[in-house]
């Protein structure tokens, strides 16, 4: 039977997977994970919003009249186009990849001074 032959052939090998979340693989240095926005550097130009195809970023007006991006983590495809387009380097790509949550409000990163 071919299935037993396959089991005997592959059984002595080391396992290919990890016991996640108890064991974690090292994240590559060029990994593109969740983005972080430094709202102190952001001038609200909106270039990141224009570049974001899945509309994970949107400009919101703060009470002081300035505009800052709101980040919808669940919509993001982690393409880092917003990182490349930001003239002030206010957006950075992190190595954070564990983004699952039970709280839908945690999926939206609001600029300071706004609430949803």
Question: Predicted segment positions?
Answer:
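Basic, alpha-helical nucleic-acid-binding regions used in initiation and control of genome expression
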Residues: 79
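Non-ligating segments of multi-cofactor redox enzymes
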Residues: 1-62, 70, 84, 88-116
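Hydrophobic/aromatic-rich structural module bridging two neighboring secondary-structure elements via a short loop
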Residues: 68-75
């Amino acid at each position: 039977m071919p299935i037993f032959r396959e089991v005997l052939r592959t059984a002595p090998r080391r396992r290919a997977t990890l016991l996640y979340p108890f064991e974690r693989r090292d994240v590559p240095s060029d990994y593109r994970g969740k983005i972080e926005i430094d709202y102190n550097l952001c001038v609200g130009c909106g270039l990141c919003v224009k570049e974001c195809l899945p509309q994970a970023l949107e400009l919101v007006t703060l009470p002081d009249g300035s505009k800052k991006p709101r980040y919808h983590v669940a919509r993001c495809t982690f393409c880092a186009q917003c990182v490349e387009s930001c003239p002030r380097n206010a957006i950075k790509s992190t190595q954070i990849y564990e983004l699952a949550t039970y709280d839908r409000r945690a999926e939206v990163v609001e600029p300071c001074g706004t609430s949803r």
